[in-house]
Amino acid sequence: MFQSNQYDEYNKTNKSDEENESNENENENENENENRSEDGDQDSEDSFIYEEDDEEEEDTPKLSFGAKFLAKHGHIEGQGLGKEKDGRIDLIEVDRFQSTKGLGFAENDLPEFYRVTKHILEDEDVDFPSKQRFEWISCNSEGYNFWEGFPVDHTLVKFVANDSITDKPRRGHCSVELLMELDQHKNALDTLDPNRFYVARKKSNPYESIKGSIFINRAAVKMANIDKLADLLTPIIPVPGKPRDFIYFGDVCAGPGGFTEYVYWKKTRGGKIKGEEGLDLDDVVKGFGFTIKGQCDWNVEKFSKQIPIHNFVKEYGLDDTGNILKSENIRDFSSKVFYNTNGFGLQLFLADGGINTDGKESLQELMLQQLILCQILTMFETIGRGGNFVCKIFDTFTPFTIGLLYLVYQHFQSFSIVKPFTSRPLNSERYIICKNFLSYRPMNIIDFLHYINSLLNNNQTILELIEINSMDPNFLRYILESNELICLRQIKAFSLFKKYVEDIELPPIDQKEIRAKCLEEWGLPKETKYDIENYQKHKNRQKHHHNNHSNNNNNNNNSNNNNNNNNQHQHQHHQHQHHQNQHQNQYQHQNQHKKYNNNINNNSNNSSPNSSPNLTSSPNLNSPPNINNGNNHQNNNNNNSNNNNNNNNNNNNNNNNNNNNNNNNNNNKNRRFISTKLVKNNSQFQQKPPPPHRHMSPLQIQQQFLLQQQKEQQLLQQPQKDQLHQLHQQQSQSALPDFSAANFMEALLKRKNDSQQ
């Protein structure tokens, strides 16, 4: 695609450089003239030598870097390159616009019809409208009633030999001068370089940048242009039992399916079926396709993804080849259409058939005669009353083509021939558009056309179907005016094309503005097909990522809630065990206190009066506890070990949850179009378990010692009964073999004396 901005910038830079050079030359000339006028009165030798030096400098050209490099290596100007000095002498020209050809590419000379010259675009060359006008004609006489009683008579058909085909039949329905001028342009294309042809065609066609818009090919945009002119998708007679806007349509010889894609796109409003509740695609549109298998087959997979097309029916005829030139395939397709439409027929029939005629453009109309006949025959076989018809044709100069068009003209209420803007202006392509079919399966016409088709399949060449003199003068006048109008437009397009062939630096027309206006006029989006598909893919990826991200968040939140619940349950269990241990210790302490009271009472009865209550000593922290206290400590240690195990299990669960979260985060990081706001680690949302049991620190020991001293002071302040209880407790402890180190020797001596006595 050629952008006008690049050429505008290039021309601006060239113009600015040329203006700067011209200004510099003028300044230099003025300075030299001033110097010479000032020094003209002086006839000194210095001034004379200075002028001679200037002349010598002007005569000796400046050498370029390449010339200096070659001269340095012994190259002499005027001799060829290489060891034998028989190589290239001229410099290699740099082609800025055809850089893909490579250096040294020798382009073919232009044909005699073209000359390399510089051109300027005029106002007529740039005037290209976006709104198109055309003319309808109607048949005054009820021709379809005439053909209902018309017998098939092969005597009306004129035959000619195959070797006597000439272009003389063309001269009857167009100006000879226009045809001769048009033939000159077409014949010059035979010897034109293909690359130069394609470049000039793109630059000279102002509607080239429209291309296929959002559809599979240009045919869909042509259909959009035609539909804007004629409103063909609105049914004239509604189908019984269907909504008012529902249509049956047929698409013949239209692979890969541009017409079909547009019809489904337009009827479904861009892929969005709107209407009453429960409205299905079968209540909006249904299509039947017939095309030849192979390279021209349907390519439904490349249709726009947002367009529903699941009810489209593809047929290939009785022999499963899709060859429409065979009458048995046409009858098979017709029977299936009427079976699926309950005998109602099609409300829209589209035909876009064509063949390759490269190098044989002058014989294009003769080569397409049978194909056009079979498309019109299939239309008569399948279309219902009130249906519309669109068919692609080319030149309409021969009596055979004009006879076919006359049959169509007499069976429709409105008839027209249109060359849409989206059709390339250089070719002779055009479309016949017909509205409101006035008959229903005219069997005489159908049988007559089947008979003609059988003759063509037997290599019979037919010159004329209906005598020209018997046709409607209004129809013949319209054919003549249509041919001349299209010829004039073709000649105008070829004149602009010739300028771009002769001047490769001529900038193209601003195609962006024309494209935007045409798409707005035809009701098509300005974005391309790939832009919409890429946007839809990106949107689906974001939606898919959002769902995965929300699922991951839900899973993480659920796991966090489960972990928190587990931790809370475990913490509650730990507290419950701790309370149970405290209750057990209190219960054991109460029992022990009761025993002590009983012992004190017994000892008080048996004690001597000389005993003193001041014999009590402060408790020793290094003394071992009693047996009951040892059991209590064992229970506490067991409980602490259980709590440690529970805490370890909690930590393991937390580690597993953290690993799961890390895996989820890693999976999210590997995704495309991922949001940076990922779920944080679950560990910061978890409730921390209680700290495990540890050995007492020195500070804790000191605090416990102070607490015990306070308890001792409280005991000293108790009554005598409590002091006796403490004395009895010390005496019971002295019976044990384990004493403090300070009184150990004294206790041994006392026991020894007691044993001796």
Swiss-Prot record:
One of its GO terms (cellular component) is cytoplasm. Keywords: Methyltransferase, mRNA capping, mRNA processing, S-adenosyl-L-methionine, Transferase. Residues 1-61, 538-670 are annotated as: Disordered. One of its GO terms (biological process) is 7-methylguanosine mRNA capping. InterPro entries: G_patch_dom, mRNA_Cap_2O-Ribose_MeTrfase, RNA_MeTrfase_FtsJ_dom, RrmJ-type_MeTrfase, SAM-dependent_MTases_sf. SUPFAM superfamilies: S-adenosyl-L-methionine-dependent methyltransferases. The active site is at residue 392. GO terms for molecular function: mRNA (nucleoside-2'-O-)-methyltransferase activity; nucleic acid binding. Residues 62-108 form the G-patch domain. Residues 18-32, 40-59 have a biased composition (Acidic residues). It comes from the Eukaryota. S-adenosyl-L-methionine binds at residues 257, 301, 352. It catalyses: a 5'-end (N(7)-methyl 5'-triphosphoguanosine)-ribonucleoside in mRNA + S-adenosyl-L-methionine = a 5'-end (N(7)-methyl 5'-triphosphoguanosine)-(2'-O-methyl-ribonucleoside) in mRNA + S-adenosyl-L-homocysteine + H(+). Its EC number is 2.1.1.57. Residues 538-548, 570-581 have a biased composition (Basic residues). Residues 549-569, 597-668 have a biased composition (Low complexity). PROSITE patterns: G_PATCH, SAM_MT_RRMJ. Residues 214-438 form the RrmJ-type SAM-dependent 2'-O-MTase domain. S-adenosyl-L-methionine-dependent methyltransferase that mediates mRNA cap1 2'-O-ribose methylation to the 5'-cap structure of mRNAs. Methylates the ribose of the first nucleotide of a m(7)GpppG-capped mRNA to produce m(7)GpppNmp (cap1). Cap1 modification is linked to higher levels of translation. This is Cap-specific mRNA (nucleoside-2'-O-)-methyltransferase 1.
